[in-house]
Amino acid sequence: MSRPQVTVHSLTGEATANALPLPAVFSAPIRPDIVHTVFTSVNKNKRQAYAVSEKAGHQTSAESWGTGRAVARIPRVGGGGTGRSGQGAFGNMCRGGRMFAPTKTWRKWNVKVNHNEKRYATASAIAATAVASLVLARGHRVEKIPEIPLVVSTDLESIQKTKEAVAALKAVGAHSDLLKVLKSKKLRAGKGKYRNRRWTQRRGPLVVYAEDNGIVKALRNVPGVETANVASLNLLQLAPGAHLGRFVIWTEAAFTKLDQVWGSETVASSKVGYTLPSHIISTSDVTRIINSSEIQSAIRPAGQATQKRTHVLKKNPLKNKQVLLRLNPYAKVFAAEKLGSKKAEKTGTKPAAVFTETLKHD
């Protein structure tokens, strides 16, 4: 099966003579539901354990007064001469008491995700990076990008200096997305601002390489720009926030290696026992399939249109004659002939006269 060709661009932004076939992973089904499920589970695996102190709320001496004083049985601080004496303690409803069900560090922090499900979500996220509408909907500034997916020469992997790397990104049209990241830096709302998460900013392009010859260090200090190896692509980077459509810049070597990593119709995947997911139907034009002669010859002609009554008022057939006749047509004949009021005729034979005379004489 022939696949579309993708042009390779040089570090100066010019299109080269090289053209690569679109890898098969870009034709994988895009499943936002699977991506969201896997992302929410995988995103929990990097959490650090936290808990309140086991002594919190219990660092005081308190004892219940018991019954007979017309007050609650909650433990109360002893002593006198201060406002604290006599106040409730320990309980979660008390000021200065412990919380209800204090958090423990031995909570189950990690979530297990099926291996094949994670691969399905990653393949969907990769396929979504080639859909321009999804990339734009995610908020990336790709109006000046010559082509999506964007493939750059392998020379990008050998860049050592940040200045040269930024110049290469500007040359291929990613400058607008870099400016968007710089302008988006804001102070975080909430308590995270004093927990080493003081600032928030948007995500920029993701640069995918095949071999690190200096590109990682060159781009690690550019705001919003992330790097990833093509052999270990991460769903957290391909779809941040479980939102499909990350702007990805591929190097030529990494783009060529996608078929080796994920497999295709002719090349087996390097993942053991893995088959790339495919669509249930190969043609997306369902109208053309339904109206084809093969389908139309096998289906029955359409019947009369039926309209379902949304609300039916139930009527008592014992009081409503029309409803009674609709349910029981024989009721009309039954009423007209007055079959319910006729007396049954006795068909028994009269005794003989000799028998009657005999009874009288006796």
Curated annotation (Swiss-Prot):
Changing K332E: Leads to an inefficient release from ACL4 with a delayed assembly into the 60S subunit. The eukaryote-specific C-terminal extension harbors a nuclear import signal and delivers the ACL4-uL4/RPL4 complex to the pre-ribosome, triggering uL4 release from ACL4 and incorporation into the 60S ribosomal subunit. It is found in: Cytoplasm; Nucleus. This is Large ribosomal subunit protein uL4A. One of its GO terms (cellular component) is cytosol. GO terms for molecular function: RNA binding; structural constituent of ribosome. It comes from Saccharomyces cerevisiae (strain ATCC 204508 / S288c). The modification N-acetylserine is found at S2. Residues 277-362 are annotated as: C-terminal-extended nuclear localization signal. It comes from the Eukaryota. The modification Omega-N-methylarginine is found at R95. There are 2 genes for uL4 in yeast. Component of the ribosome, a large ribonucleoprotein complex responsible for the synthesis of proteins in the cell. The small ribosomal subunit (SSU) binds messenger RNAs (mRNAs) and translates the encoded message by selecting cognate aminoacyl-transfer RNA (tRNA) molecules. The large subunit (LSU) contains the ribosomal catalytic site termed the peptidyl transferase center (PTC), which catalyzes the formation of peptide bonds, thereby polymerizing the amino acids delivered by tRNAs into a polypeptide chain. Its main location: cytoplasm. Gene3D superfamilies: 3.40.1370.10. N-terminally acetylated by acetyltransferase NatA.
